[in-house]
UniProtKB/Swiss-Prot annotation:
Transmembrane segments: 122-142
Function in brief: Plays a role in inhibiting the effects of BCL10-induced activation of NF-kappa-B.
Membrane topology: Single-pass membrane protein
GO CC, any one term: endoplasmic reticulum membrane
Organism: Mus musculus
Gene label: Card19
Subunit organization: Associates with BCL10 by CARD-CARD interaction.
InterPro entries associated with the record: CARD19 (IPR043574), CARD_BinCARD (IPR042146), DEATH-like_dom_sf (IPR011029)
Predominant subcellular localization, coarse grouping: endoplasmic reticulum
Protein's cellular compartments: Endoplasmic reticulum membrane; Mitochondrion membrane
Official protein name in the record: Caspase recruitment domain-containing protein 19
Coiled-coil segments: none
Keyword terms, alphabetized: Disulfide bond, Endoplasmic reticulum, Membrane, Mitochondrion, Transmembrane, Transmembrane helix
Length: 183
């Protein structure tokens, strides 16, 4: 297995990074400032001004920056990846060089990040479901046992443990045990 250098990875990732909408202007500016201001200083002030020139298009500036870093050597490319990780972590995790068959070590390091991600529904979906369940429980608790008010509710809830997890079904069956005898 051959180890890819950071310069090789940058050559492989350049078309992906320069693609439309991948990096915003603010992210590119932050990366350039990171390479210019923090130790080790990769870009001089003059180079940073050149790559931050608002008169040139973002794609041209980014292509110039990446080719400049490739010419400067391995350390410069490594610092670019470090700055990219800091300022555009979601993009960094989807780079083509991280998923190439030559670079299987990155796959081993990447599995932990994906396992901690939330589902695409997010926390509001969880809170909405929890609120719905709490509201239904409160309605059943406060509702009088008059059969005219909710005639089929107890029958529907009697079959819901089939769908609900077994831990919850124990409590639901215990709650309904008194009312099932009268059905």
């Amino acid at each position: 297995m051959t180890d890819q250098t950071y310069c090789d990875r940058l050559v492989q990732d350049t078309p992906f990074l320069t693609g439309q909408g991948r990096l915003s202007e603010q992210q590119v500016d932050r990366i350039i400032l990171q390479l210019n201001r923090y130790y080790p200083q990769i870009l001089t002030n003059k180079e940073a001004e050149k790559f931050r020139n608002p008169k040139a298009s973002l794609r041209v500036r980014l292509c110039d920056l990446l080719s400049h870093l490739q010419q400067r050597g391995e350390r410069h490319c490594q610092e670019f990846y470090r700055a990219l990780y800091i300022h555009a972590q979601p993009l960094h995790s989807h780079l083509p060089s991280r998923y190439s068959p030559q670079n299987s070590d990155c796959r081993e390091l990447d599995w932990g990040i994906e396992s901690r991600e939330l589902s695409d529904r997010g926390p509001m979906s969880f809170l909405a479901g929890l609120g719905l369940a709490a509201g239904l429980a409160l309605l059943l608790y406060c509702c009088p046992p008059d059969p005219k008010v909710l005639p089929g509710t107890r029958r529907v809830l009697a079959f819901s443990p089939v769908i609900i997890d077994r831990h919850v079904s124990r409590y639901l069956l215990a709650f309904l045990a008194d009312d099932l005898g009268g059905l």
